[in-house]
Amino acid sequence: MAQKHPGEGGLCGAHHSGGASLRTLGPSVDPDILSFSGLRDSAGSAPNGTRCLTEHSSPKYTQPPNPAHWSDPSHGPPRGPGPPLAEEDPDQSEASSEESGVDQELSRENETGYQDDGNSSFLSIPSTCNCQGTPGIPEGPYSEGRDSSSSNFCHHCTSPALGEDEELEGEYDEEEPLKFPSDVSRVPSEKKPAPRRQRHRVPAKEDTREGGRRDPRSPGRHRLGRKRSQADKRRGLGLWGAEELCQLGQAGFWWLIELLVLVGEYVETCGHLIYACRQLKGSDLDLLRVWVGVWAGRLRGWAQVMFQFLSQGFCYGAGLFTRFLRLVGALLLLALALLLGCLQLGWRFLVGLSDRLGWRDKATWIFSWLASPTWQRCLILLRESRPWQQLVRIVQWGWLELPWVKQRTNRQANAPVAGGRYCQPEEEVARLLTMAGVPEDELNPFHVLGVEATASDVELKKAYRQLAVMVHPDKNHHPRAEEAFKVLRAAWDIVSNPERRKEYEMKRMAENELSRSVNEFLSKLQEAMNTMMCSRCQGKHRRFEMDREPKSARYCAECNRLHPAEEGDFWAESSMLGLKITYFALMDGKVYDITEWAGCQRVGISPDTHRVPYHISFGSRMPGTSGRQRATPDAPPADLQDFLSRIFQVPPGQMSNGNFFAAPQPGPGATAASKPNSTVPKGEAKPKRRKKVRRPFQR
């Protein structure tokens, strides 16, 4: 093993009596002189028979140099292998030069001593200094500029041609040194990456000292060291190969030592483990099994106790919660009963008091007067008045806050309001984009602005400004804010121009009037289509469409199924255990409930029969015809004729047979007259003949 020697700057081996040693001479590990000696280890046997490495009495290698000491100024200049040092501050150049002189003297003495002894075990590399005077003395790594690359050249080796390098900048790039995983493999002869070279400048007046000498802190000294390193790099290519070989060999040697130490530790650990396993007995396994069983039983017991504790806690908590809910329910029920009792008692007290004081008749008169049409008409006029609407707007805007009045909210989704708005700009943009596809002629500007149709110009202007601030593309960064602003601008153009606003109001009034007329016409038409004329009361009865198909329209109690029906079939069905009779008929391909018409006609039909008892004819009987008559397709329905006659004020007598269109054949206008003859059986006068005539076919 190797360790630092306290008296030398490099690495020294163990004691000369034994142990492996690696020694380098000089104040630092210099690539010029390297020495190796044999490796020798000793081993001994432990009391248990295991062979292991024994320690020597001489100092042993403990660890590679601590990198923390390289930056600690209290330990002096670092010696031995270490990382390449960064560029030193100019203020420390003088101290470095003094230390370099001492290191050079020690190096000369050591080299001279070993040359005198004639030791041939050292590998000597001749100096490349070409000076005639002083022989080449390798400089320490902490000399000028701490540049170890110039250790093989003296300061006399500076060629005049190096001055030309001052005008070049970045011509030759510095090569990075070999990097090894271990810090011990780094030697002072490594090339450190030099910073970017700068042009040489003439020293200023403040850079010189008294007597004309140059300030040693000036950066020119470091540039001189870099110039020498560049010259060494270009001239000593052969020497660099030897240095790299030495570095690689030293790094491999340290790697081998670390590998041997690691393998020895693992072998020793495995030996202890094997020895411990050999000492085990059969009883130890039994004890281990018993120990595992005991701990397994303990863990199982703890798990059971924990499970029981959790289950009991859960059950207890659930019971408490249910009891609490029952208690709350009982309290609420009690409070409700007390409230109802108090209300009933109070109402009885008020009624008795009013009876004694005679207020009951007055209260009845007041309530009847409030429910009168006159009071309702007065309330409607008050609500439609402009002062009342202004008061409502003031309350809704928040100018007059009342605790029982809610603040104004959006009428449609997120529609803006004239004041007190809490809508977000994104919501307003989304609302306006829903109306982007509406044409401008059909656009409702009041809905876009979020105001009433009766809003004043001031309200419209205020609403437009508020929306413009939220929707404008310069204020809102929504990708479709421009489209929303176009919709808002179109609405504002309509209401801001008096002529366009008047035109829009006239158009809206016409549309409202037209829609009202159309709605009335459709409602009357729907009513007419869902009514039947009655010849007995000369009125109309409603009919209701049923959700039944003609193929399964009639219910038969004998077959317990539904039978198909034909056009004009008239039958009855019972429900509610026979207490309710409902009459049905198939007209225009649909099943209708005509119970009102049948009740007015006083038709008596047995319900749930297998055969159709009666048939409704929609056309008058022609002479010489009998049986069922079908309505002619050219004649319009009787209900539509009556409806059109009422609209156009045409008296029924002017229509031929009640037909407004004067059809050549007897139209269905005679349905009302023929219905009693066709539906009401003549059993009252001639019951037998009527049955034979009306039931000629079997169902």
Swiss-Prot record:
One GO CC term, this protein: endoplasmic reticulum membrane
Transmembrane segments: 251-271, 301-321, 327-347
Subcellular location: Endoplasmic reticulum membrane
Polar residues composition-biased segments: 117-133
Single Gene Ontology BP annotation: protein transport
Ranges of biased composition (kind: Basic residues): 219-228, 687-699
Superkingdom of origin: Eukaryota
Main location: endoplasmic reticulum
Membrane topology qualifier: Multi-pass membrane protein
Biased composition (Pro residues): 75-84
Ranges of Basic and acidic residues composition bias in the record: 203-218
Protein name according to UniProt: DnaJ homolog subfamily C member 14
Organism, scientific name: Bos taurus (Bovine)
Gene designation: DNAJC14
